[in-house]
């Protein structure tokens, strides 16, 4: 039977199941297949903080969304076109996100009375498929006995029923791989390697995967398969990469390109622990990782290593930053290079450990006692975490200062294709250690001044133990300008407070001009953001432009100091929109610094901003600025084949 | 696999001294206490025990024969934590309680440094208690000097975690209801590899303990009884008084029977508690007296001896090295893991970085 193949330009699939159903792995494999196939893509893993929440319940649902396309995309997508639900709870938890007409594939095997009741269904929604007004009335639903067919497909391997049924995620992956013409070799290769030591499990998983594919090809339930052509991308070699992995690689690269040993002091915390795990594998690059007794000891050890001449790094999430604040202040006072990585999550307090948020910007700016400025750098996408880590290291080493690197849960766990850089393209970083003072003609050596400053950067010398003639004492008490001894002199304190601020401000001299994307040059509204909102903002902006309106976009990588031309850029627009996953922290800073009427677009749901909602907010502001009504839906050019990246 | 097996596997020699990897002074060159004295004015109260310890340390450091620039003193917050400013070495006066964590990073990053931590009873046992026990557990190569004056001095006289129950202070006007820590018992409980106690006023004993602590590879904890003349004067009077000290100090010498009070009293096992107690030697006989074994790998007896320290007014305390055992250090093993991996790598770092970034499932767009 030959089946119809339909062309699509993009698809958003969400795999959802119980925490133990292997949905993250399934989504990750589908993503890898799509990446190797050459689609552009973005992913959004979404899982509970509990390792195994009660089975079959809504709090226990784990999902993985992947958006893949034949052209460049910017987000993991607002709403899935396809939902794969492994049980009633997964169906119920995700149904509300689906647009009308979406495809729903469910494992009918798990729709038992008990599971239905756990999910809060009074009646089995599968029994009323096709009835107008029923739960699933608006969707194209395919009930498939995934578990039953999986057990049947793997029976020759003699597994227990429980083990056999566990391969059902691979059956589902096989089915979806068929539907979207994904290459199968990478997954078979992956399973072969992953289960190399347990042959029966390995064979069962491969058999389930193939059975899923074959089922799609033969069953009449699925009449159509789809083709999404590879996306044009700049020449180069690519891989799919998550933000945490890219950030860890960026730190390794910073060590190599500065010729400094990297020293990580860290305490495990979601969603930052992956960076500790990854760096602990790279000892061959001279990377030392210390799993400390607590957050404070993590940064303490990093500061000690930094004083010793290593690239000191500590990684954590918001609650950990709260604990490290005093030590960050010490690094400000002692003016030592230090990288502080904050993979932000929902707060306050323990908040939402596995969900994303960007509400730690003001904590990074001001969350210490006294005037304690630190540099702040924020990556904008998973792959960008690599470059941002290198940039943070450059600033820390060059200016002898702590640098806060603000990632977040969305880009940390999400992934995208990443062009692998040539090593020779990467910047080098010069530690410029202080050397022993020269002996004068009279045989005397000048007194070493640990707080003397480089006139260009205002950085003090990095004088490491073991260098004769540079013995000196540093610490948290105020230091005398130049000589660095304890000083309680009022004028000195005023001077030092200003010097520490001036040093951070000086970093702006080394920054490139802020890029503003304003294709028409006639935009009156500027949308400006920072961090992981880059994708959703870009997608929202695209939609507004597609509808025929002008809007400019800029994205801040450096939050402290701001780029020097930022004020001038802001002044050039009538309206400024600042979308953030917080209640307006960048807005507050921009308003305070530049006296502009920045308008916030603020959503704090623990999820990335939705491009469609953002587009509406931008359109409204464009309408106000231009004095014309803006209705996006009416103005979209129906002939366009370009993606709008919003819900259909 | 035991810890010793691990160190053998990593190719470490079984024994090293604490300063073995620290560069020594060139042959024939010597230093004096003056070389270790910074130009900073010492600002402790007149009569403070810290002066005596500073003098002893400045007098002792030249004996190590190490390059001054390879010695680092790290401190926390408190009166004693000003110590690094007065020594002409590298030093960091850090934040309250965190010195052991900073020293851990320093000592792990560099094998060629002699790392010292100066801390007090509040700094080490209250706000920094967690870092102290974990430093001891890890056995990082450093020496911790814990100045115990049983009071908060810098904040002007509140009770500390070593103050006796019932102590009347500014924050406990009707008496403290906190149970005090015994720092030596705590360190032994954390299985520290070197635990000793000495007194600020006995320079000879202090110096001998410092010397043994510096020679020990691993975390050495030295509790120093130190008098605060302003807020807790006389706390150690019985251990110092000409007429009382023989009756109060229980001297610990490895390989010697534990006797004091001119040989009249001795420490014997107490079958009733499983611990130890003080007995009249005349009654029990010298053979029944415990012979001190600081090298016993089991810390149980050392712990029992530490319990002979009076918990309230200090009328009795064992003084000396309670425990000194060989155990692989965290920093040596961490460096060995890194250097083994570095040595096994053939290509240049840039080449290997390229291979790392390009590993896994990749595709090429032309």
Located regions from the model:
Chain B
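Glycine-rich beta-alpha junction loops
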Residues: 77-79, 149-151, 202, 225-230, ...
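Conserved thiamine diphosphate
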Residues: 112, 160-213
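Active-site-proximal loop->helix
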Residues: 129-136, 154-167, 186
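Thiamine diphosphate
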Residues: 77-153, 207
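Short coil/turn connectors at secondary-structure junctions
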Residues: 40, 67-71, 99, 110-115, ...
């Amino acid at each position: 039977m030959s089946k119809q193949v339909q062309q699509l330009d993009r698809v958003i699939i969400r795999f959802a199941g119980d925490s133990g159903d292997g949905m993250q792995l399934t989504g990750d494999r589908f993503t890898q297949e799509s990446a190797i196939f050459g689609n552009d893509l973005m992913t959004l893993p979404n899982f509970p903080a509990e390792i195994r929440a009660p089975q079959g319940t809504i709090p226990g649902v784990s999902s993985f969304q992947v958006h893949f396309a034949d052209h460049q995309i910017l987000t993991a997508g607002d709403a899935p076109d396809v939902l794969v639900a492994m049980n009633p709870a997964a169906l119920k938890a995700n149904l509300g996100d689906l647009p009308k007409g979406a495809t729903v594939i469910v494992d009918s095997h798990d729709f038992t009375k008990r599971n239905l009741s756990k999910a809060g269904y009074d009646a089995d929604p599968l029994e009323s498929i096709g009835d107008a007004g029923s739960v699933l009335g608006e969707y194209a639903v395919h009930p498939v006995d995934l578990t039953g067919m999986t057990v049947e497909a793997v029976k020759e391997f003699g597994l227990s029923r429980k083990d056999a049924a566990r391969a059902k995620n691979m059956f589902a992956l096989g089915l979806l791989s068929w539907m979207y013409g994904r290459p199968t070799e990478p997954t078979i290769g992956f399973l072969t390697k992953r289960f190399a030591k347990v042959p029966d499990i390995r064979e069962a998983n491969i058999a389930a995967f193939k059975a899923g594919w074959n089922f799609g090809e033969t069953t009449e339930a699925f009449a159509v398969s789809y083709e999404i052509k590879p996306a044009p991308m700049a020449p180069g070699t690519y891989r799919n990469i998550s933000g945490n992995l890219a950030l860890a690689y960026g730190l390794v690269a910073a060590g190599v390109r500065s010729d400094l040993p990297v020293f990580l002091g860290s305490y495990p915390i979601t969603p930052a622990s992956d960076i500790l795990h990854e760096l602990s594998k790279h000892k061959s690059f001279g990377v030392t990782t210390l799993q400390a007794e607590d957050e404070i000891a993590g940064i303490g050890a990093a500061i000690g290593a930094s004083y010793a001449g290593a690239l000191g790094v500590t990684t954590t999430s918001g609650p950990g930053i709260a604990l490290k604040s005093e030590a960050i202040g010490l690094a400000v006072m002692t003016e030592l290079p230090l990288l502080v990585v904050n993979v932000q999550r929902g707060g306050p307090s323990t908040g939402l450990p596995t969900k994303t948020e960007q509400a730690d910007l003001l904590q990074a700016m001001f969350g210490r006692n006294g005037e304690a400025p630190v540099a702040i750098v924020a990556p904008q996408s998973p792959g960008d975490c690599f470059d941002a880590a290198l940039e943070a290291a450059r600033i820390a080493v060059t200016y002898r200062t702590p640098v806060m690197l603000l990632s977040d849960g969305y880009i940390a766990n999400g992934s995208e294709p990443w062009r692998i850089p040539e090593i020779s393209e990467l910047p080098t970083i010069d530690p410029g250690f202080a050397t022993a003072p020269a002996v004068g003609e009279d045989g005397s050596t000048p007194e070493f001044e640990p707080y003397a400053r480089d006139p260009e950067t205002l950085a003090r010398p990095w004088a490491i133990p073991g260098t004769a003639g540079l013995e000196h004492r540093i610490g948290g008490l105020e230091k005398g300008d130049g000589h660095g001894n304890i000083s309680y002199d009022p004028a000195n304190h005023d001077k030092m407070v200003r010097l520490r601020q001036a040093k951070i401000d000086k970093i702006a001299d080394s920054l490139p001009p802020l890029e503003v994307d304003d294709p028409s040059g006639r935009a009156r509204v500027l949308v400006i953001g920072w961090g992981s909102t880059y994708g959703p903002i870009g997608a929202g902006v695209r939609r507004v432009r597609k509808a025929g309106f002008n809007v400019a976009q800029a994205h801040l990588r450096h939050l402290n100091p701001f780029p020097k031309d930022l004020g001038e850029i802001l002044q050039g627009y009538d309206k400024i929109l600042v979308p953030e996953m917080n209640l307006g922290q960048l807005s507050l800073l921009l308003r305070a610094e530049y006296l502009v009427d920045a308008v916030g677009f603020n959503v704090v749901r623990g999820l990335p901003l939705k491009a469609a909602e953002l587009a509406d907010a931008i359109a409204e502001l464009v309408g106000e600025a231009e004095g014309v009504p803006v209705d996006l839906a009416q103005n979209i050019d129906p002939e366009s084949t370009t993606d709008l990246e919003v819900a259909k | 696999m035991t810890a010793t097996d691990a160190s053998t596997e990593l190719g470490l020699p079984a024994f090293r001294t604490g300063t073995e990897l620290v560069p020594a002074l060139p042959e024939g060159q010597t230093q004096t206490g003056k070389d270790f004295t910074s130009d900073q004015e010492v600002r402790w109260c007149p009569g403070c025990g810290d002066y005596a310890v500073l003098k002893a340390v400045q007098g002792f450091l030249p004996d190590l024969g190490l390059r001054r620039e390879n010695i680092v003193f790290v401190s926390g917050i408190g009166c004693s934590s000003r110590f690094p400013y007065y020594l002409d070495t590298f030093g960091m006066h850090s934040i309250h309680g965190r010195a052991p964590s900073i020293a851990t990073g320093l000592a792990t990053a560099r094998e060629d440094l002699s790392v010292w931590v100066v801390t007090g009873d509040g700094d080490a046992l209250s706000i920094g208690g967690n870092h102290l026990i974990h430093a001891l557990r890890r056995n990082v190569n450093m020496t911790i000097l814990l100045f115990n004056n049983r009071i908060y001095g810098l904040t002007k006289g509140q009770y500390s975690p070593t103050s006796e129950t019932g102590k009347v202070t500014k924050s406990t006007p009707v008496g403290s209801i906190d149970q005090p820590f015994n720092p030596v018992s705590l360190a032994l409980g954390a299985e520290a590899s070197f635990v000793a106690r000495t007194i600020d006023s006995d320079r000879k004993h202090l110096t001998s303990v410092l010397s043994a602590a510096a020679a020990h590879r691993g975390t050495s904890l030295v509790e120093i009884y130190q008098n605060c003349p302003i807020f807790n004067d006389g706390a150690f009077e019985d251990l110092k008084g000409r007429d009382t000290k023989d009756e109060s100090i229980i001297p610990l010498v490895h390989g010697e029977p534990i006797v004091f009070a001119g040989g009249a009293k001795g420490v014997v096992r107490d079958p009733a508690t499983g611990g130890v107690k003080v007995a009249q030697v005349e009654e029990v006989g010298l053979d029944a007296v415990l012979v001190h074994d600081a090298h016993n790998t089991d810390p149980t007896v050392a712990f029992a001896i530490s319990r002979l320290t009076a918990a309230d007014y200090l009328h009795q305390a064992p003084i000396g090295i309670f425990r000194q055992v060989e155990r692989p250090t965290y920093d040596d093993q961490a460096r060995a893991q890194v250097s083994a991996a570095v040595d096994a790598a053939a290509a240049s770092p840039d080449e290997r970085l390229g291979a790392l970034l390009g590993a896994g499932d990749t595709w090429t767009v032309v």
